[in-house]
Amino acid sequence: VDPIAAQTLADRILDWREAGIGKRLNGAKAPEYRAAGYAYGPRNGAFETVEELKLVMGMTPQLFAALAPALTVYSQTPWVDPSVAPPEVLRALSGMDEGATAGLLQARAAGGSTPVVKLGHAFTITVQANGQGGLLVRRSAVVRLTGRQSAPIWVYRWD
């Protein structure tokens, strides 16, 4: 994506998430969506699913397919955990050049220490069962620990 298109899409993503009528320089709020023929406007709140990103004006199927594997809406934290973040996300972080990214990935692969960050409350749990004849069954769930005794876990997604 060229830098101008990237900045435009970034502004539109931020406008999608932020309440209020104020629009970023290259962003889009409800009037811009209507003018472009969309039957909806921005949420003006946090993304509820990664797939919702497809609704942002200017998001292409190809770009979404490239970005989606590195995104989550479940962490409920404003930061990235470098001990588990995909390489693409690490490269996008401020101050993470190729050398720093490669060093962190090597340390992770070797079981070395990585920066300690506070863990969020959302986790992906994946279970795989191998059966006879090469049968393979895999299921994943995204869950959140609530800290409440009456409902200790919320299931966000079950695949």
Identify what each model region corresponds to.
Residues 1-159:
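Compositionally biased linear targeting/interaction segments
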